C-alpha cells in the first residue's frame, strides 16, 4: 500500500459561507487543514475590520473539539475602503489580506470595485503595512468572452497594478490559464498564485461534453485541456510561486441543478486527496508537500505547520451529497471513487 506523509497543509482560498452552513463547511475543511484564508463575500460582505472579526468568532465557534484549525481573515475591498481601515485590519492580527472582487465578477461581488483607481489609496496603505492583496482575476465586461476574461484581466488590469505597486504582495487566485501561469512565473517574487484541485483535474470537456454537468461550473470557468496541462506543470514544477487554494464554494443542490445555476464547486470534503490524485497523474507526488504545505505560509510570512498528515492510496466512494446547513451540497466526485484518503 502506498503512503505519503506530509507537513499538515493549509488552504489559501476557501468559502465557508455563514449561518447554518458554517458548521458543515468548517467540519469538512478542519479535518486536516491547519489554516484557511476565508473569503469575505458574505451577504453583506466583510467590508470592515469589525465585520471580519465577528465572522472570525463565528467560524471559531464551529471548529470541532481537538482541532487546531485557524481561520485567516480577509477584508472585502470596495470603492470606499480607506487607508485607515487597512491599518486597523492589519493591526487586528487576524486579518492578513484584502480582496479585489471586480463588481459582478462572481458570487456576492455586487459590492465590489467599479474602478481600479478607487482602491489605489487602500493599495498604497497595504503596500506600506505589508498586507497581502488577493485578486479575483477576471474582467466583467459582457463583451469579453467568458473564456478570455482571465487573460484580458491580466493584460489590462493586473499588469498595471504590479507595475504601480512593486512592493505589494499579490496573489492571483484560482488561476485557470497558461496566460496566468506565464505572468506569475515571469513576475517578481511578490506575485504568486493559488490553483484549485478541480482546475488541475478537469477541463471544460468534463463540464460540457456529453451533457452539462453543473457541479463543474465555477468561476473562473474551466478552460481547455492545454490550460489544464499548464496548471499541472506549474503546480508540479517546484516553483514557490504556486500553492494550494481550493476555492471550495458550496451551493445547495437545487441552486446548482437549475435553469440558471450558481458558480462554485465543493471540494472541502476531500481537498488534499484530490490534489494527491492530480500530482500523481503527472508523477509528481514528491512535489505535493511544497505546494500544499510550504509555499503558502512562506509567501504569507507565516510559520509552516509543525505536525504531519499521512495519505494512503486506498480508494473510497464519495457520498452523493453532504449536509449543508438545512440543505445538501453535491461535492466534486459525488458517487464516484477517490484514490487517496487521509489515514
UniProtKB/Swiss-Prot annotation:
Cellular component terms (Gene Ontology): cytosol
Name the needed cofactors: Zn(2+)
Record flagged with keyword DNA-binding? no
A single GO BP term for this record reads:
'de novo' UMP biosynthetic process
Cofactor binding note of this UniProt entry: Binds 2 Zn(2+) ions per subunit.
**GO molecular function terms attached to this record:** dihydroorotase activity; zinc ion binding
Name of the protein in its database record: Dihydroorotase
The encoding gene: pyrC
Amino acid at each position: 500500500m502506498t503512503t505519503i506523509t506530509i507537513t499538515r497543509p493549509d488552504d489559501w482560498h476557501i468559502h465557508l459561507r455563514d449561518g447554518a452552513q458554517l458548521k458543515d463547511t468548517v467540519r469538512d475543511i478542519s479535518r486536516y487543514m491547519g489554516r484557511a484564508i476565508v473569503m469575505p463575500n458574505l451577504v453583506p460582505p466583510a467590508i470592515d475590520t469589525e465585520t471580519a472579526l465577528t465572522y472570525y468568532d463565528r467560524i471559531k465557534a464551529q471548529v470541532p473539539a481537538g482541532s487546531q484549525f485557524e481561520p485567516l481573515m480577509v477584508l472585502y475591498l470596495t470603492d470606499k475602503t480607506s487607508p485607515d481601515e487597512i491599518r486597523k485590519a492589519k493591526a487586528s492580527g487576524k486579518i492578513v489580506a484584502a480582496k479585489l472582487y471586480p463588481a459582478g465578477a462572481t458570487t456576492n461581488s455586487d459590492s465590489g470595485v467599479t474602478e481600479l483607481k478607487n482602491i489605489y489609496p487602500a493599495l498604497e496603505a497595504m503596500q506600506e503595512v505589508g498586507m497581502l492583496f488577493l485578486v479575483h482575476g477576471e474582467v466583467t465586461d459582457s463583451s469579453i468572452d467568458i473564456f478570455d476574461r482571465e487573460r484580458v484581466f491580466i493584460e489590462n488590469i493586473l499588469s498595471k497594478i504590479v507595475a504601480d505597486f512593486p512592493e505589494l504582495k499579490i496573489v492571483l487566485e484560482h488561476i485557470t490559464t497558461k496566460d496566468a501561469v506565464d505572468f506569475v512565473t515571469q513576475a517578481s517574487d511578490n506575485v504568486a498564485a493559488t490553483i484549485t484541485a478541480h482546475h488541475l483535474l478537469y477541463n471544460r470537456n468534463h463540464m460540457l461534453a456529453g451533457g452539462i454537468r453543473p457541479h463543474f461550473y465555477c468561476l473562473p470557468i474551466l478552460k481547455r485541456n492545454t490550460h489544464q496541462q499548464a496548471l499541472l506543470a506549474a503546480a508540479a514544477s517546484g516553483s514557490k510561486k504556486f500553492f494550494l487554494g481550493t476555492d471550495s464554494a458550496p451551493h445547495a443542490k437545487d441552486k446548482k441543478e437549475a435553469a440558471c445555476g450558481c458558480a462554485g464547486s465543493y471540494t472541502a470534503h476531500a481537498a488534499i486527496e484530490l490534489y494527491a490524485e492530480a500530482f500523481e497523474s503527472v508523477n509528481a507526488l514528491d512535489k505535493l508537500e511544497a505546494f500544499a504545505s510550504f509555499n503558502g505560509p512562506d509567501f504569507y510570512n507565516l510559520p509552516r505547520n509543525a505536525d504531519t498528515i499521512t495519505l494512503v492510496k486506498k480508494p473510497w466512494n464519495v457520498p452523493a451529497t453532504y449536509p449543508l446547513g438545512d440543505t445538501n451540497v453535491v461535492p466534486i466526485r459525488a458517487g464516484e471513487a477517490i484514490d487517496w484518503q487521509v489515514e
